[in-house]
Amino acid sequence: MGLILMLICAMMTSISIVREKETGTMEVLLVSPVRPLWMIIAKMVPYFVLSCVNLVTILLLSVYVLHVPVAGSLFSLALLSWIFIVVSLLLGLLVSTIARTQVEAMLFSGMVLMMPTVLLSGMIFPIENMPLPLQLISNVIPARWYIVGIKKIMIEGLGISYAQREMGILMLMAVVLLIISLKKFNKRLE
C-alpha cells in the first residue's frame, strides 16, 4: 500500500509545476499576487483528494478481495495514511521544482523514488537484516515509517498512540520537504 500510494502521489504531482513551465502559464502565475506557499498548496489539494480515493480503493481491495484483516481503528489508519499522502505529494512537488521537463519529472519520480522505496522501506527485506549503512539510509525513506505504522495499526490492532513516533517522523519529513520545495521554487523564480 505504501509503494502504490507513494508512486501515484509523487508521479501525479511531479509533473504539475513542470507542465506550468512548459505551457507558459507559470509566467502568468508569477506575476499574480499569489505567494509560492499558496501555489504549492493549491497544486496539492486536488491530488490529495485523488490520493484519498486511491487509499479507499486500496483498502477496499485489501479487505474484500485479499482478505487482509484490519485489526485497528480505521480513523488511525486514515490519519497515518493522510500524513503519508502529504509527504508523498510534497516529494513529488520537490521533483517538480527540480525537473526541467515532464518526462524528466516522471522518470525521476518513477525510478529514483521507486527503487529505494522497494528495497529500503522494509516492505520486502526486513530492516533489521540489512547492513548498518542501509539501515541508516532507510531512516529517510518515508515509506519505511508508514509501513511500520501500518503494521502497528492494521495488523497488531494497536491504537494511534502506538504510532505517534512514526506519525511525528512523517510530519517532520513533510515540513522539511515543504521548506526545501519553497526554497527551490523561490530560487527558480529568481
Which ranges hold each PLM region?
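Long, hydrophobic alpha-helical segments
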Residues: 1-13
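Juxtamembrane helix-boundary/capping and inter-helix hinge elements in multi-pass membrane proteins
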Residues: 23, 31-37, 100, 159
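Membrane-spanning alpha-helical segments of multipass transporters and channels
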Residues: 59, 69-190
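Transmembrane helix boundary and interhelical loop/hinge segments in multi-pass membrane proteins
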Residues: 11-32, 44, 190
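Selective transmembrane-helix segments that form parts of the transport pathway or gating/packing helices
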Residues: 34-61, 78, 82, 167, ...
